[in-house]
């Protein structure tokens, strides 16, 4: 062999051995404290990728759960949950069922507020049971975790990270009551940033801006009731008065499952990272069963229909209306539904208990997507460029539908008031009107035009926090100011006092000068007149 070639090869081999011996690739330890439902499904992809990169992950979950089950890429650690599975599912699934019950707006509002209160109480009691489990807390403390990855919608993970003094990375869509804005000290002008649940866009009329400004006041009481249990628990554990905002403010990085293709543009802070579409990065080939359904659809293609994991059954009358509408279009309908089969179900409609939603939407034959407007489904529609018919049921789904409708990428239906004709017309509109396909493809192109995939970006920031043991340099000094310092009210008051003092001195000086200049002449004139008389 040519000795000139061997020398470089020997050098390259030595370099590779040296690189393998370096300690930089040593894995870290991640404590994962997830939220139930679709929140966990996208966080799970991050945990899987962290495991693939050599990190150890421990997922802390309640004994009673719907979606969180043990898998080979993490260790599942459970804790006692003070509710039965039936009670838990009743509370979790209750909001979805109410979406199909017609009732007055005022009643709906107060029932929604009561549901939010029950939801927070349920998780607050669960959190108290966990944090008072001294054996488990000692075990977690001795495990020397490098970072806590948690969803602050369930603030217990943030509280645990604060208590154990471990850097935290938050993985979220948003936090109720606007707490995420307060905890990040992110500006939120009500003139163009719509509040959650208002169903407003970023272009508001005067009356809409009035509504947007007053809306948080209507939630003030229920928000106070909802967060008080966590604040009491935080104060008890940390031995000082602690607000929930203060607990959440110690997050190193906030990973928001959003971007400005879907969300309205707004100010952001240095420790806020946007990973919208993270749930639709990983795609798999269709199984033989679903491939057969798609191929059999012919030139008309398929429509994917799913109202999310929280909707297991629809009232019979409404289900029959939906089935009637679906039977009127030429496309093949793949409907994820576990309820009673409608008696009028057409031949073109296939009921399945589960479907690979993202993979089906990514197929060239996907013509439309009927969705409840959850953020995961919306992003899968955007990623794959499929126009949507949206049937929002509760929570932020109404806001999500409003965003997509504003962008001309879908049609929104009121699930309570819609008829079979309404659904039929909406489907035909988004399928046959080319503008909807063009708009969603434009959004898809914008969304995909990025320097790094959302999953890689999320994993990078988790590893970043592990490497640097937090990210205090990204935390704005606004956290250390009082409310009057933040708004510079003390400075304004000081400057105003100076101005008023100067004005007062000038006024007094002028008054004194006037008296000196004109007061003496007046007295002279008066005395002169008295002498002439």
Curated annotation (Swiss-Prot):
Membrane topology: Single-pass membrane protein
Glycosylation sites: 133, 141, 295, 433
EC number: 2.4.1.17
Molecular function terms from GO: enzyme binding; glucuronosyltransferase activity; protein homodimerization activity; retinoic acid binding
SUPFAM superfamilies (alphabetical): UDP-Glycosyltransferase/glycogen phosphorylase
UniProt KW keywords: Endoplasmic reticulum, Glycoprotein, Glycosyltransferase, Membrane, Microsome, Signal, Transferase, Transmembrane, Transmembrane helix
Pfam family, one: UDPGT
Stored Gene3D superfamilies: Glycogen Phosphorylase B (3.40.50.2000)
Transmembrane regions: 491-507
Signal peptide extent: 1-27
Catalytic activity, reaction form: glucuronate acceptor + UDP-alpha-D-glucuronate = acceptor beta-D-glucuronoside + UDP + H(+)
InterPro entries linked to this entry: UDP-glycosyltransferase (IPR050271), UDP_glucos_trans (IPR002213), UDP_glycos_trans_CS (IPR035595)
Protein location: Microsome; Endoplasmic reticulum membrane
GO cellular component, as recorded: endoplasmic reticulum; endoplasmic reticulum membrane
Any single biological process term in GO: liver development
Keyword Transcription regulation: no
Function: UDPGT is of major importance in the conjugation and subsequent elimination of potentially toxic xenobiotics and endogenous compounds.
The name this protein goes by in its record: UDP-glucuronosyltransferase 1-2
